[in-house]
Amino acid sequence: MKPTVILTAALLCVLSPISFAKPLKVFILAGQSNMQGHANTSTFDYIGKDPLTGPILAAMRDAEGKPRVCENVWISSLGCGGNQYSDMLEKTGKLTAGFGASDSEIGPEFTFGIYSEKTLKVPVLIIKTSWGGRSLNIDFRPPSAGQYQLPKAVQDVWDKYPLGSHGVPKLEDRKKWQEDKDAASGVFYRALIEHVRKVTKDIKRVCPEYDEKAGYELAGFVWFQGFNDLVDGQTYPNGNYDEYSRLLAHFIRDVRKDLSAPKLPFVIGVLGVDGDKNVNFRKAMAAPADMPEFKGNVVAVDTAPFWDHDIAAAQPKQVEYDAIVSTAHTLKIDGTLDKERKWDGYWKPVGTPLPEERIWRFATVDATEKKDILEKYDGRRFRDITLPAGMENWHTPEFDDSKWTEGKAPIGKGVWKHSGITLDKFPSTWGTGEFLLMRSTFEVEDLNCDSYRIAILARQGFHVYLNGQKIHTYIWWQDKPQYGSIVLGKEQIKHLKKGKNVLAVYANDQYDPNSPEHYAAIDVRIEGITKADQEKLDLALEEVLSPKDREALKGASNAGYHYFGSAKIFAQIGKAFAEAIVNLKK
């Protein structure tokens, strides 16, 4: 994009109200999650790193560097509150950051309002309706499009499977399937129209300074949607999206009819997720703008040019980096510790004897009270249970564990098999109980590390205690056999001391409903890293995630299908939408 010459930021949303001598310009913004906007305000600074977008950032902030409050742009936003997929909660006010998917996020509305008001020099009202995960072919289906029907190519496949198949309902269930489609069709189209009517019927409710004598003008509509249709292979088989073009043309006609605005300027925000990929879908989205009946009042704005390739390149590296730093140790395919992993030499075990020589004392118990028993299979099995009498303080240093079983870790049972790794040989056997209580003692000579962590192998959740104090709880599960890395904060580390330390763990086993043999493995150790070794590790990790990658990721707060939650991307999109609307009006 070429640099945009702008006036000072103060002129974009001036601090004194503009006269309502001219009609209030009302713009409608509608779509799904990318119209909601998942760009966190924490990514604003990244906009200023690029000289081409720096002026946009200046327009988005006030003199104190805070998100600008536009004194002459108001907004009513429906769909971003509560359950963002279905709720009809409304948020109103003067336009600023926080009218995105959450109070700390923006979508296209922020810069759309800033730049439309700047150019038109009249007060602006934005009516935004957006719900996540909603399609045009069902949820926003326009009335004139007719009943949802399967494409012939898909119907031909269904006809071959009257008894049903994967993704194909049985013949006797298809009437109900169609009824469900019909019931869902157009629900969010109607909600959109109803909300626009509600707001325009009583504009003062949203815009207290509205001049009723001057009135208002429906000045434009922006449609920014598409992801759920893009990935719907049933409705659009074989990458053919002609039906989307047909539906969108009906949508434009119906919106204009239902809002009594036959020439309402209409902007199609062409989905740009993944940049210049998804060519067939992007062409189908843009196609209505080329129809003769829409010439001069419908325009397609391609958002692919705003895709950030630096962020796109960095995000997969971030995933790899996170996997490395969240893993303390890996296992070989035979379940033994992989001592050749290149990242393992920087963190060192704390205390003696060394973890592999340390003796644990342990006992297993079962849930006996009704409230503690799981009546059906649940992937998340970890829970607290009532322990047998006398074991309430089992994790404290003074507890007498002399009658418990002794052995080295990992303590386990059964076969834990995942990701090509088979863990079925253990120095110590877990026993029959579902829950394991284990304790060990180690001596610490000095505390000269800069950071400390728990390195733990566990199939299910766990509590970890250090000298009687709980220092970590994990309630989920771990599919792949490996040692997780949990870096400890000051509140946890203060319980580590010179001399004798008692480390204790509470954990439970796992089973598969298709193979009811219970299995488990547990091992835990405290490890530390010096400042010098941390610097060496950070330098080594730059081969995975470079300083350039880290800088790019400052501009991201979400996944790629949400344009990385990048304010830089959404700011450019909103500005482009505003400029397109203004040009249509000219």
Task: Give residue spans per PLM region.
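Conserved, well-structured interaction surfaces
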Residues: 21-219, 224-354, 443, 531-576, ...
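Aromatic-lined ligand-binding clefts that engage carbohydrates, nucleic acids, or primary amines
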Residues: 404, 442-468, 503
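Bacterial N-terminal signal peptides that target proteins for export
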Residues: 1-7
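Short beta-strands within extracellular/lumenal beta-sheet-rich domains
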Residues: 431-445, 484-488
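Solvent-exposed beta-strand/loop surfaces of large extracellular or lumenal domains
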Residues: 466-489
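An acidic-aromatic loop/edge-strand motif
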Residues: 40-53, 337-391, 477, 490-545
